[in-house]
């Protein structure tokens, strides 16, 4: 993946709040959120605040190792239940591998992401931003702000 899409903290909060507005419009009485660790943790915290949801759990699936997709995903921890009246939150749906696991674990859940790539898009119930399949998304928790020398000094 040669191109990168840089996500700032501000962008993430704005997009997640847009998702919260959409979820409010569904008029569903949500009982909780399941955050897909780790990418869904920050969006889940924002959604929980905006929707007034106090019950937040996690499902922990190892699918990425820093910047490369793992072929074999490992379920480390599951949340209980079938997902009824639950929002499952991840930061993105990429190839759909993790999303298929989520759908099997929580068939009654409402599955949302902030970003969606073409191969996984149909596996989520809602998302905010379309991303091309060949673009790598850099999330704010994976980056830091650092000094860059002026061009004249290079």
Swiss-Prot record:
The gene is gpt. It is a peripheral membrane protein. Its EC number is 2.4.2.-, 2.4.2.22. One of its GO terms (molecular function) is xanthine phosphoribosyltransferase activity. This is Xanthine-guanine phosphoribosyltransferase. It comes from Buchnera aphidicola subsp. Schizaphis graminum (strain Sg). It is found in: Cell inner membrane. Belongs to the purine/pyrimidine phosphoribosyltransferase family. XGPT subfamily. Homotetramer. Keywords: Cell inner membrane, Cell membrane, Glycosyltransferase, Magnesium, Membrane, Metal-binding, Purine salvage, Transferase.
